[in-house]
Amino acid sequence: MSRRRRRRRKRRNPAGRLIALVLTLVVAGGAAAGGIWYYAEHSGNPLTEYADEKYNADLYRAEPFSETLCVSAENVALDGFTDEPSLHAAGLFNLNERSVEYGYRLYDKLYPASTTKLMTAYLALKYGKLEDMVTVTDSVTGFAADEVVCGLYPGGQVKLYDLLCGLLLKSGNDCGVAIAEYISGSVEAFAELMNEEAKKLGATGTHFVNPHGLHEDDHYTTAYDLYLIFNACIQNDTFKEIISMSSYTMSIGDAAGNTHSLEVLPTNYYSLGKTE
């Protein structure tokens, strides 16, 4: 990491066994995750003995998809907590124990709003280069007055890293568009990539239309899918670095060679220390 970035960032029985396996598949399938396990016991059948010898090697074994995930197929009560009627859906996931501590309507369809930006960030980190300079297009304009932007302008030159900071800290919708065009060439192509990658993560109850989350009827997800996406994001150290910042100063270059600075503050009250 360059010194410049450091300066700009501020931190703060056989049958019985077979049934058990089938049930495991049902649970995993209900959680938008899939895995196939096969178990059988053989006694003296040459064909099965050959199969065991030739095909039971580690080369042919794969880790079940949900092995490292928190999985639940139904609501999970939390001792001492009564479901809040105002909640559309909620989940509390213990990543260390890989368990769902609380789950309420985990698989109900909901509109993700700005949590959409998690998927945008995930793809930027997966396919982009942080030091790449991104040229901003006219697509970043036209947002309504009450829709959050970082102040990007057509022709501006911004590093992908800075766009990620604006996206994740301030929830800048313009940064989401700039990232989408950088990765895929257009918002529409990026939305297709978002949907492909969401399915790879097991988020099969999700469909994206844009990179920022501004409401569209065909743009939706579930609480559990959001967990899957966020869980994928936090495997990346840069993602964790950015969301831990208390502020960041973006640099935007113009056609004349001038550089403009823009401080972005988190819209997350936890990051700002305004709540506990």
Where are these regions (language model features)?
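Active-site-adjacent loops and short helices of periplasmic peptidoglycan-processing enzymes
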Residues: 41-224, 228, 233-237
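Intrinsically disordered, low-complexity segments enriched in small/polar residues
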Residues: 14, 78-79, 153, 255, ...
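Secondary-structure junction/capping motif
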Residues: 2, 159, 186, 266-267
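Membrane-interface motif at the C-terminal end of an N-terminal transmembrane signal
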Residues: 31-45
